[in-house]
């Protein structure tokens, strides 16, 4: 039998139906003093390991990976780099909840406040006694309101461009039925919107790619405020209500004065799971904030908090054997 090149210790969880795979042992050392440096080291030297962890036959296109790292910031419990089948994520709300619950499962943390260091900043997470987890996300804001894009298959579509840890194009008027039974059509429509944004050179701030498309509609459940469908990088859809997407939505609601600070927002995802969101204005927290590029955030920047549940599904070892033709995954 061929020897193993790598053995990765992992814990799989799901948050509102969306899976997270936390890699906590066996990964090669990454070069760099900061987590941003380590992200570059990951990208440049070990992208084949991202593919091996995420892609079939060991993973799937829905899975989000979370590489656990020692923190470089003294305030942080751990560092984490999120990634998926398409590449790397600055931040992942459902993934953060999954990581916190997985660490609790390992008895490495208990109920209380914990900080995770991500490439886009420190993220505050609170593990509650009932097992739920609240994530105080990175500063979030609306960049542009009601941007028009012509989608050949759909006509004129308007949406807000907002940052919630990733870049989103948020669309409320789209004529689609947001139901789990309609996922194929929703995926096609959101991919068409994404392609139209690229063709029109419509981007986030500093020409950043808008890699998430989010559709909203009213829900059949009168206990929730909205239902969404989120297309993620790699063309998979988010089973959860999407933590960074809900943060981006809260930023737009705040900018339009449609949601007051600390007022609760119940965001339902396409499979029916719910995140509870709220926010405070960054200025009210007396915080001097700079984005990862070192520039000041806009005046109406918010600090969102997202609360949800995650559940551990598996604890195992991923093995990459030397003679395995698919040790680096099956290209998607």
UniProtKB/Swiss-Prot annotation:
GO molecular function: 4-hydroxyproline epimerase activity
SUPFAM superfamilies for the chain: Diaminopimelate epimerase-like
Catalytic activity: trans-4-hydroxy-L-proline = cis-4-hydroxy-D-proline
Signal sequence interval, chain numbering: none
Enzyme Commission no: 5.1.1.8
Pfam families assigned to the protein according to its UniProt record, in alphabetical order: Pro_racemase
Active site (record annotation): 92 (proton acceptor), 242 (proton donor)
Record family assignment: Belongs to the proline racemase family.
Name this protein carries in UniProt: 4-hydroxyproline 2-epimerase
Organism of provenance: Psychrobacter cryohalolentis (strain ATCC BAA-1226 / DSM 17306 / VKM B-2378 / K5)
């Amino acid at each position: 039998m061929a020897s193993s090149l790598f053995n990765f210790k992992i814990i799989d969880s799901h948050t509102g139906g969306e899976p997270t795979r936390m890699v906590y042992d066996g990964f090669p050392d990454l070069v760099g003093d900061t987590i941003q440096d380590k992200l570059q080291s990951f990208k440049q030297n070990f992208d084949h390991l991202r593919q091996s962890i995420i892609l079939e036959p060991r993973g799937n296109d829905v899975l989000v990976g979370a590489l656990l790292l020692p923190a470089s910031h003294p305030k942080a419990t751990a560092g984490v780099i999120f990634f998926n089948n398409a590449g790397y994520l600055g931040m992942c709300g459902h993934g953060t909840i999954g990581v916190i619950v997985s660490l609790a499962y390992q008895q490495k943390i208990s109920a209380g406040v914990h900080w995770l260091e991500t490439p886009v900043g420190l993220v505050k997470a609170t593990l509650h006694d009932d097992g739920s987890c609240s994530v105080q996300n990175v500063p979030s804001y609306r960049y542009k309101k009601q941007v028009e894009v012509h989608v050949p298959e759909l006509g004129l579509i308007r949406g807000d461009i907002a940052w919630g840890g990733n870049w989103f194009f948020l669309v409320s008027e789209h004529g689609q039925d947001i139901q789990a039974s309609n996922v194929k059509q929703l995926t096609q429509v959101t991919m068409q919107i994404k392609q139209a944004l690229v063709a029109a050179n419509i981007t986030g701030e500093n020409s950043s790619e808008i890699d998430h498309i989010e559709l909203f509609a009213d829900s059949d459940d009168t206990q929730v405020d909205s239902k969404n469908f989120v297309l993620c990088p790699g063309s998979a859809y988010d089973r959860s209500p999407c933590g960074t997407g809900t943060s981006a939505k809260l930023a737009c609601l705040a900018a339009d004065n449609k949601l007051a600070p600390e007022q609760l927002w119940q965001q339902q995802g396409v499979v029916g799971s719910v995140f509870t969101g709220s926010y405070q204005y960054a200025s009210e927290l007396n915080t001097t904030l700079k984005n990862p590029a070192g520039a000041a955030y806009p005046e109406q920047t918010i600090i969102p908090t997202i609360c949800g549940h995650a559940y551990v599904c598996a604890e195992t070892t991923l093995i990459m054997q030397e003679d395995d033709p698919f040790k680096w995954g099956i290209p998607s």
